[in-house]
Amino acid sequence: MFGNLFDHVEYQTHEVVFDKNHKVNLNISKAATTELHLTGQVLWPASYLFCYFALKNKALFKDKNVMELGAGVGLVGLLVSQLGVKRMIMTDGEDDIVSLLEKNRILAQDTFVKDGNIKDAVLSVKQLWWGVEGEIEKCLGPKDNCDIVIGADILANALGDPRLPLQCAKDILMYNRTDRVKKQFVCAYRSRSELNREYIRDVAKDLGFTLQIVPPSSFLPAEIPSTHTIDEDMLLCIFELRP
C-alpha cells in the first residue's frame, strides 16, 4: 500500500510532550497544507483536546479495541495506544496521509523500544474511506470487533455533513457485535455555531446515539504548553450506542 511515497517528501520530526510519561514523536510534512485531500498532514488543535481527555480518562480505553477515524499524522491514536488499549487501528483515506501515518507508527514503535517501554497494544495503520462498501471489512477481520471509535476534528470541517463520519463510526461499532456492552464514539471538534451543534445532536439521535458533552474544564490541566493550541469553542463529545 505504502510503496515509495516517502521518497520525494520532506519531513520534520516534532515531539509533543504531555507529561514525563507521555510523549509522541511525529514526522510532519514540511509542505503541510490545508488543501482538503492533504489536511491530515496538519496537527489540528482538537487533537490536543482529545489527548488531554484521554490522559484524564485512561480507564475508558484500557483493554479495549480502538479504531481512529481521520487519524492524520497520528497524534491521538499514538497517545491512546500508550494507555493500555488491547488494539489500536489508525485509519485515514488519502494515500499520502496513510503513508505518513505509517511512517509515524514505525517511529513510535522505534521510540518505544529505545525507551525500554515496549507497548503491548497491537498498533496498525489501515486505509479507510468513509461510506464506501467493503471498507470496514478491510480493516477488521471476520471475527474482530471494535469497542471504541475515536476522532479529532472530523465532525465539523470543510468536508461538510457530519452524518458521514457518525454513520461510519456506528457501522464500525456494530460490526460483528455480539455482546451487550455499550459502544462509544469519542470525538473532539471545533463547534462552528449553535446551529451546527444542534444538527450534530439531531443526526446522532437519528442514528441511535445518546450524546454526552464533556466540559473541557473537567479534564484540562491547570497549565498547558503554549504550543498546545486549545480554543474555547472546542467540544469533547461521547456518542454512545447502548445494548
Outline where the language-model segments fall.
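S-adenosylmethionine-dependent methyltransferases
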Residues: 1-243
